[in-house]
Amino acid sequence: MATQNGSPTDNTAPALNVLVQYIKDFSFENPNAPRSLGAPQGQPDVNIQINVNARPLAPGEFEVELKIEGGAAVQGNTLFAFDLTYGGIFRLMNVPEQSLQPVVLIECPRLLFPFARQIVADAVRGGGFPPLMIDPVDFAALYQQRMMAEAQNLQTAGQA
């Protein structure tokens, strides 16, 4: 098979396709409204946790879930809280076995993140607050932390 310019196509090149993206679970709480919607009595303390989970669905297909949860409080009073699980189904082709886990846990959530970030920003704005713009996430560092924690757990389990 050849491309339009006559050069052969490379059917063995690694490929990543997003088949579908979706909100799997989402909640937004504004427990102190309308009192919390006035001028804040200090700088809000914003707390955000991000986690990634993945599972195989079929050969070469994976469901990846990006979980973002957090909220904001001032002087111990909750302004808002949110919990989002944003998922995607990805097809990976010609990815070497040793690269499969990093691609699934780094590249796939990297592609999901901008959409999940927008959902959170819109919900916070819809709750009466300025939109929360979550900083970009280093999913490679998150993956490395996960691998180190798993290695530590295996080492601890081996000593027991």
Curated annotation (Swiss-Prot):
Q: Name one GO biological process term.
A: protein tetramerization
InterPro entries in the cross-refs: SecB (IPR003708), SecB-like_sf (IPR035958)
According to the UniProt record, which cysteines are disulfide-bonded? none
Q: Enumerate the UniProt keywords alphabetically.
A: Chaperone, Cytoplasm, Protein transport, Translocation, Transport
Kindly indicate whether the keyword Cytoplasm belongs to this entry.
yes
What does the UniProt entry say about where the protein is found?
Cytoplasm
Where do the coiled-coil regions begin and end?
A: none
Which sequence ranges are marked TM in the entry? Answer: none
Q: Does the keyword Cytoplasm apply?
A: yes
In terms of Gene3D superfamilies, this protein maps to: SecB-like
An annotated GO cellular component: cytoplasm
Q: Which Pfam families match?
A: SecB
| Functional description taken from the UniProt entry | One of the proteins required for the normal export of preproteins out of the cell cytoplasm. It is a molecular chaperone that binds to a subset of precursor proteins, maintaining them in a translocation-competent state. It also specifically binds to its receptor SecA.
Q: Which HAMAP family match?
A: SecB
Q: Please give the subunit comment from the record.
A: Homotetramer, a dimer of dimers. One homotetramer interacts with 1 SecA dimer.
Q: Which family does it belong to?
A: Belongs to the SecB family.
Identification of the protein by name: Protein-export protein SecB
Supply the source organism for this entry: Azorhizobium caulinodans (strain ATCC 43989 / DSM 5975 / JCM 20966 / LMG 6465 / NBRC 14845 / NCIMB 13405 / ORS 571)
